[in-house]
């Protein structure tokens, strides 16, 4: 069963869900597979389809992966933000605080999340040119966002994290992923949501981000 959402409603209400995850309700395998089927309809560079999705639901493995998530977050904590991030944070301090509050709730309950989805792509971008990086990331990010949209349509919540970054090699080894050949693109907690009444989020006004013809 899917929610009765128009395309515009789906696009404007697929939120990063950290607090409103139903941690006691398992996610059926068939629903995850439906979302993956839709994800792989996304565009991919030269139709090479180098994407992969690792889904973790087994309790002991989830605990191991959750531990890596927490240690990776701790490793990233305290790293300096660039000036662009700082400027945007100052633009909406209340929203930023909400993100931190949600992240705290997620980390406190990470071992209770019923499923993790780790999108991956064949080929690494370490020390690659901007053009190579653009082509590689452009072949996994659209599919991952399509997965998240499909999940929302089925009453599931997701949040995009890159917590795997500092400990990507360890996470890859834990999941049997050949690190030298495959890059882990994100770390996505997945669960049913508590309620489905998500709303569009406050955003920077269009006239501050839209540029016609030139910057």
Model regions and ranges:
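N-terminal accessory segments that position/regulate proteins before the catalytic core
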Residues: 1-34, 57, 64-67, 75
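C-terminal helix-cap and adjacent tail motif
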Residues: 2-3, 13-19, 183-215
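Glycine-rich, charged/polar anion/phosphate-binding loops
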Residues: 37-41, 100-104, 171-174, 195-197
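Small-aliphatic-rich amphipathic alpha-helix that forms the alpha element of a beta-alpha
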Residues: 39, 115-174
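Glycine-rich phosphate/pyrophosphate-binding beta-alpha loops
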Residues: 42-47
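Short, surface-exposed beta-edge/turn micro-motifs
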Residues: 50-51, 113-116, 184-185
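Glycine/small-residue-rich phosphate/adenosyl-binding loop
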Residues: 55-138
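A glycine-rich helix N-cap at a beta->alpha junction
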Residues: 74-86, 175-200
